[in-house]
Each structure stands twice: as C-alpha cells, then as structure tokens.
Amino acid sequence: MNLLAFGGGTKRTAKADAVITGAGSGIGRAFATELIARGGRVVCADIDEVGAAETAERLGDRALAVRCDVGSIDDVIALADTAEGWFGKPADLVINNAGIGTGGAVVGETSLADWRKTVDVNLWGPIHGCHVFAPRLRAHGRGGIINVASAASFAAAPRMSAYNVTKAGVLALSETVSAEMAGTGIAVTVVCPTVVKTNIFDSDTIADSASGLISTLVKWTGVEADSIARGVLNAHDRGQFYVVPQLDAKVIWQLKRLAPRTYTHMLGLVERAAR
C-alpha cells in the first residue's frame, strides 16, 4: 500500500526542468513520465542507452536521453553540462535514482567485485550527483534534490550487506545535504521504499538462491513505480524530507526505533530460518 499517492500539490515540481538518473526503466522512468505530465522537461540519464532513449521517445520533445555512468565523475559533470545547455539554465530538480540490487550471500561470501560494483553505482552515484549539482542549485537559488535510498538503509536485512550499506550511505548523505541546504531555497527529499515493481534486482549481483524469493516478493507485495513516483513528488512539493511510502517500511522504521533489541532478534530468526 502506497500512502503518499494521494494529495499534495505540484507547486515545486510543476514545469520543473529535471535531471533523472536511472531513467531508462522503473522508478526513474516513472519520475520522468510524471514530471512531463506536470509540464516539465526531463533529461533521462542512464548507462543503458537503449532504455534512456526509449523513455525519451515515449515522452516526446520535452525529454532528452543521455548516456551516463553515475560511477564516473566525468560522466556526471558532462550530464550536468548537457542538461544546462539543453534547458538553457541550470536544472530545477535532480533525482539521484540509479541503482542496482545486490543480495543472497552473507558477509565474507559476497564477492568484493559485487561490493565494488554496488558501491560504485548505489553510493558513488548519489555522491557524484550531489557533488556536481548542489553548487549549481545553490547558484540558481532554488530547486530540489531527491535521493532514492531504500528501506534497506535502516532495515539491515541479512544477506543484503552491500545493498544495505550503500543505501544507508545515501540516507546519511541526504541528511547531511539537507542540513547544508537549510535557508538556501533548495529542498531535499530522501525516499526509502521497500519492494517496487521494477527490474532493479535483475542483476548478476543477485545470487541464484535469492532470485526466486525476490521475484515472489515483487509479484505479491511490490507497488507500481508510477504510484511511488507520484507520491514522492507530492511529498517533495510539501517540503517533506523523509519519504517512507509503504506500510511495511513504516512498521520496520518504528519497530527498530522503539524496540531495537527485539528487531535485531527477529532478524536473527529470519537468517537462521533461511539457512
């Protein structure tokens, strides 16, 4: 159940010129579609050139596809320059959404290659995005940053160490940037969803032993990406920082804070049952 799709105006996101990473599919494509519906223009960035082009083609002449590897600072700088040139001004909104799923193995069995790949995309991506776009937004004097983290940033589920760590980093980065942007006219929002119906877990960093469970979760509990995107943009319009859109994530968020020992014990039971 998505609790955010209802209500909320479109003042901040109306007619926004936005840059979206990971816009070739999933939540990124949904953000682009919703922003176009709100009268904006979007730069659809993705390492998957075909996916980015498909998104832009669907959206018409107010969308531009750009290939970007968010793990490369040079690519992100080029993305910002391209967007500014196309818009004719700095972007109003930056959505650091690109990410990959990783899971299925315990610490010590997750390969270092998977760790590095996950950190490069999931953590360095938002770091690069904030590093490059934050100064431009400050100079612009208005706008916003939306960072897509995950409920994994606080849930700490077993066998998802690399994913958990990177998303926790995105949450901490967002909290820091929000404080640093206070009084500048720049709004910051961080999104912490659980299961969304996207292809993020269609990755070689997902162990075969976990792929079946993930597919089942997506099928039976996943929320549609367009519902998440709409709710997040509405929340950003309201100036909301933390966005925890689904009921299961809200329960985890509260349980961990109100009863941390109980929560940790429950995670241990889940891990033992999975062996």
Sequence positions of predicted segments:
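Active-site helix of classical SDR
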Residues: 130, 166
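Conserved glycine-rich Rossmann-like NAD(P)H-binding loop of the short-chain dehydrogenase/reductase
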Residues: 38-54
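Canonical Rossmann dinucleotide-binding motif of NAD(H)/NADP(H)-dependent dehydrogenases/reductases
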Residues: 4-42
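SDR active-site lid
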Residues: 183-247
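The beta1-alpha1 cofactor-binding region of Rossmann-like NAD(H)/NADP(H)-dependent oxidoreductases
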Residues: 49-50, 68-78, 112
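Substrate-binding pocket helix/loop in short-chain dehydrogenase/reductase
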Residues: 105-107, 111-116
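Residue(s) in the substrate-gating loop at a strand-loop-helix junction
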Residues: 150
